[in-house]
């Protein structure tokens, strides 16, 4: 993977350039992290005035699943790195772009291709690497889905093979739920007539995100892996509501989690931050999913770590030293839109920021939806329980008005 010997000057002929595909709140923080290291950032999304558009040097609106549009933009910008920040991309074209040497895809084009589809990454994890996972089957029709659900037993979890932020995901408790679960999965899929994955329900104690950083060890000049402290999180309808760091784990469970994370990220290759999602039951750890990029539950690291997951991503991509030190226990809580309206206003910021050791990040999205993530409150404290209380209180104080 390419390592720049020097960082150029933005907006000049020698600029070091990154092209970010996906300009939401995570892309915005990644943009800022690269800019602080002197990198010229080109932010791309499917709609105008996305959060990263508002801070990048240049912004573009294209259909990122359109191979020709992606190639044309790459040819125009000539980026050193392409940084995917979402899954819905023309990943086959990214593979060709990488093979032709037009740009380095982060962490690799293959990783981006595999992780956009739950089938690809699950087969890699379970069937090739032998990582512990829940029982699962993939289905193309309602009839296959019904049969798989009966074989796997109830309750089970159904998800489209391609979706994000919990869209189309549901728990099936009996045969009576099958039809509605199938219809919901189809409605939440990125493309029509998509396959689904049916998973046995894992009786777990908790779930974590283990942010795993692949970078260059400055002592040896060789690739190395670092682990941030585990992040606990609470999900609602498949989307994260709050997260906290560190999540208390037994020593054997943490060792197992790091082993699983190292194996899956080594298989994907490249450099950068990976969000490895795991279920934990006692000392046992089960692989769930992996994102080859900063993770939404990792927004808590804006408050808890010496360098946030976004800063770690930028440094690792550029081949610079990384530091995963935790500086304080902390938590994050999501601020939802609550309304369906463009150009919303926010109230309650003074009350939110009056909460001890708390900050608020509003993402600047041009349009609100009832369940759209519009901001986040992040808090620190002597312990995660207090931090969670503070973040939840602050998030509740912020109200969104159409």
UniProtKB/Swiss-Prot annotation:
Positions annotated to bind Mg(2+): 277, 289
Gene: purT
Matching InterPro entries: ATP-grasp, ATP-grasp_carboxylate-amine, ATP_grasp_subdomain_1, PreATP-grasp_dom_sf, PurT, PurT/PurK_preATP-grasp, PurT_C, Rudment_hybrid_motif
Annotated source species: Corynebacterium efficiens (strain DSM 44549 / YS-314 / AJ 12310 / JCM 11189 / NBRC 100395)
Binding site for ATP: 118, 159, 164-169, 199-202, 207
Family as reported in the entry's similarity comment: Belongs to the PurK/PurT family.
Protein known as: Formate-dependent phosphoribosylglycinamide formyltransferase
Gene3D superfamilies, alphabetized: 3.40.50.20, ATP-grasp fold, A domain (3.30.1490.20), ATP-grasp fold, B domain (3.30.470.20)
Quaternary data: Homodimer.
Pathway(s) per entry: Purine metabolism; IMP biosynthesis via de novo pathway; N(2)-formyl-N(1)-(5-phospho-D-ribosyl)glycinamide from N(1)-(5-phospho-D-ribosyl)glycinamide (formate route): step 1/1
Segments forming a coiled coil: none
